[in-house]
Protein backbone atom coordinates (compact mmCIF):
# COMPACT_ATOMS: atom_id res chain seq x y z
CA UNK A 1 0.00 0.00 0.00
CA UNK A 2 0.98 3.63 -0.29
CA UNK A 3 1.17 4.00 3.48
CA UNK A 4 3.55 1.04 3.78
CA UNK A 5 5.77 2.55 1.07
CA UNK A 6 5.82 5.87 2.92
CA UNK A 7 6.81 4.10 6.14
CA UNK A 8 9.69 2.42 4.33
CA UNK A 9 10.91 5.93 3.47
CA UNK A 10 10.56 6.97 7.15
CA UNK A 11 7.59 9.21 6.40
CA UNK A 12 4.90 9.08 9.06
CA UNK A 13 1.25 9.41 8.07
CA UNK A 14 -0.76 11.00 10.86
CA UNK A 15 -4.53 10.73 11.23
CA UNK A 16 -6.59 13.89 10.97
CA UNK A 17 -6.14 16.27 13.91
CA UNK A 18 -8.85 18.70 14.99
CA UNK A 19 -6.34 21.56 15.36
CA UNK A 20 -3.95 20.79 12.48
CA UNK A 21 -5.85 19.25 9.59
CA UNK A 22 -7.05 21.28 6.65
CA UNK A 23 -8.93 20.37 3.48
CA UNK A 24 -5.85 18.81 1.91
CA UNK A 25 -2.93 16.64 2.92
CA UNK A 26 -0.13 18.62 4.57
CA UNK A 27 3.54 17.82 5.01
CA UNK A 28 5.14 18.95 8.24
CA UNK A 29 8.43 17.72 9.75
CA UNK A 30 8.59 14.66 7.46
CA UNK A 31 5.04 13.75 8.46
CA UNK A 32 1.89 13.78 6.37
CA UNK A 33 -1.21 15.08 8.17
CA UNK A 34 -4.44 13.74 6.70
CA UNK A 35 -7.34 16.09 5.96
CA UNK A 36 -10.57 15.96 7.94
CA UNK A 37 -12.76 14.88 5.06
CA UNK A 38 -11.03 11.49 4.68
CA UNK A 39 -13.18 10.50 7.66
CA UNK A 40 -16.27 8.62 6.53
CA UNK A 41 -19.44 10.71 6.71
CA UNK A 42 -17.56 13.98 7.26
CA UNK A 43 -18.31 16.18 4.28
CA UNK A 44 -16.21 18.93 2.76
CA UNK A 45 -18.77 21.39 4.11
CA UNK A 46 -18.40 20.07 7.66
CA UNK A 47 -14.61 20.01 7.40
CA UNK A 48 -14.60 23.57 6.08
CA UNK A 49 -16.88 24.76 8.92
CA UNK A 50 -14.55 23.17 11.49
CA UNK A 51 -11.53 24.88 9.93
CA UNK A 52 -13.35 28.25 9.78
CA UNK A 53 -14.39 27.95 13.43
CA UNK A 54 -10.81 27.03 14.38
CA UNK A 55 -9.62 30.35 12.92
CA UNK A 56 -11.24 32.01 15.94
CA UNK A 57 -8.88 29.98 18.13
CA UNK A 58 -7.72 26.40 18.48
CA UNK A 59 -10.02 23.92 20.14
CA UNK A 60 -8.78 23.52 23.71
CA UNK A 61 -10.82 20.45 24.66
CA UNK A 62 -13.46 18.15 23.26
CA UNK A 63 -16.17 20.07 25.12
CA UNK A 64 -14.79 23.34 23.74
CA UNK A 65 -15.08 21.88 20.23
CA UNK A 66 -18.56 20.50 20.88
CA UNK A 67 -19.81 23.82 22.32
CA UNK A 68 -18.60 25.68 19.25
CA UNK A 69 -19.75 23.17 16.61
CA UNK A 70 -22.59 20.99 17.93
CA UNK A 71 -26.01 21.80 16.55
CA UNK A 72 -24.68 23.89 13.69
CA UNK A 73 -23.35 21.37 11.22
CA UNK A 74 -22.04 18.72 13.61
CA UNK A 75 -24.46 16.21 15.16
CA UNK A 76 -23.98 13.16 17.40
CA UNK A 77 -23.12 10.90 14.48
CA UNK A 78 -20.45 13.31 13.25
CA UNK A 79 -19.03 13.58 16.78
CA UNK A 80 -18.79 9.78 16.98
CA UNK A 81 -17.06 9.63 13.59
CA UNK A 82 -14.56 12.31 14.60
CA UNK A 83 -13.85 10.59 17.93
CA UNK A 84 -13.38 7.18 16.32
CA UNK A 85 -11.02 8.71 13.76
CA UNK A 86 -8.85 9.98 16.61
CA UNK A 87 -9.02 13.69 15.76
CA UNK A 88 -9.15 14.64 19.45
CA UNK A 89 -6.23 12.44 20.57
CA UNK A 90 -3.94 15.45 21.03
CA UNK A 91 -6.39 17.04 23.49
CA UNK A 92 -5.35 14.73 26.35
CA UNK A 93 -8.46 12.57 26.43
CA UNK A 94 -8.83 9.09 25.02
CA UNK A 95 -11.44 7.79 22.61
CA UNK A 96 -13.17 5.39 24.99
CA UNK A 97 -13.65 8.14 27.59
CA UNK A 98 -15.22 10.39 24.94
CA UNK A 99 -17.49 7.69 23.49
CA UNK A 100 -18.67 6.51 26.91
CA UNK A 101 -19.43 10.08 28.06
CA UNK A 102 -20.87 11.32 24.76
CA UNK A 103 -24.55 11.11 25.72
CA UNK A 104 -23.90 13.09 28.90
CA UNK A 105 -21.93 15.70 26.93
CA UNK A 106 -24.73 16.01 24.37
CA UNK A 107 -27.32 16.41 27.14
CA UNK A 108 -25.17 19.20 28.58
CA UNK A 109 -24.85 20.86 25.15
CA UNK A 110 -28.58 20.71 24.46
CA UNK A 111 -29.41 22.03 27.91
CA UNK A 112 -26.96 24.91 27.54
CA UNK A 113 -28.50 25.77 24.15
CA UNK A 114 -31.98 25.89 25.70
CA UNK A 115 -31.03 27.86 28.79
CA UNK A 116 -28.95 30.80 27.61
CA UNK A 117 -29.18 32.92 30.72
CA UNK A 118 -28.08 30.34 33.27
CA UNK A 119 -24.49 29.32 33.68
CA UNK A 120 -24.31 25.55 33.47
CA UNK A 121 -21.15 23.89 34.65
CA UNK A 122 -19.41 21.48 32.31
CA UNK A 123 -19.99 17.81 33.03
CA UNK A 124 -17.32 15.88 34.87
CA UNK A 125 -16.29 13.03 32.63
CA UNK A 126 -15.77 9.55 33.97
CA UNK A 127 -12.37 8.24 32.88
CA UNK A 128 -12.07 4.98 30.99
CA UNK A 129 -8.95 3.18 29.83
CA UNK A 130 -8.10 3.59 26.17
CA UNK A 131 -9.33 0.92 23.79
CA UNK A 132 -6.91 -1.90 23.03
CA UNK A 133 -4.62 -1.45 20.02
CA UNK A 134 -6.62 -3.99 18.03
CA UNK A 135 -9.89 -2.18 18.86
CA UNK A 136 -8.37 1.17 17.83
CA UNK A 137 -7.28 -0.34 14.51
CA UNK A 138 -10.83 -1.65 13.92
CA UNK A 139 -12.25 1.81 14.65
CA UNK A 140 -9.68 3.30 12.31
CA UNK A 141 -10.79 0.96 9.52
CA UNK A 142 -14.44 1.88 10.08
CA UNK A 143 -13.55 5.60 10.14
CA UNK A 144 -11.35 5.73 7.05
CA UNK A 145 -12.09 2.57 5.09
CA UNK A 146 -8.42 1.58 5.36
CA UNK A 147 -5.80 0.95 8.01
CA UNK A 148 -3.77 4.06 8.74
CA UNK A 149 -1.59 3.51 11.80
CA UNK A 150 -1.13 -0.24 11.61
CA UNK A 151 -2.55 -3.40 10.09
CA UNK A 152 -3.97 -6.26 12.21
CA UNK A 153 -1.43 -8.64 10.67
CA UNK A 154 1.28 -6.66 12.48
CA UNK A 155 -0.20 -7.74 15.83
CA UNK A 156 0.08 -11.38 14.82
CA UNK A 157 3.62 -10.88 13.61
CA UNK A 158 4.64 -9.38 16.93
CA UNK A 159 2.70 -11.81 19.12
CA UNK A 160 3.34 -14.99 17.17
CA UNK A 161 6.91 -14.99 16.04
CA UNK A 162 7.01 -18.15 14.04
CA UNK A 163 10.25 -19.75 13.03
CA UNK A 164 10.18 -20.25 9.31
CA UNK A 165 12.70 -21.69 6.96
CA UNK A 166 13.25 -20.78 3.39
CA UNK A 167 12.32 -23.41 0.82
CA UNK A 168 15.99 -23.32 -0.19
CA UNK A 169 16.79 -25.02 3.12
CA UNK A 170 14.84 -28.15 2.19
CA UNK A 171 16.29 -30.90 0.08
CA UNK A 172 14.21 -33.14 -2.16
Task: Name every feature range the model reports, one short phrase each.
Residues 1:
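Ligand-binding pocket segment of bilobal, Venus flytrap-like solute-binding proteins
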Residues 4-171:
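Sliding clamp-binding short linear motifs
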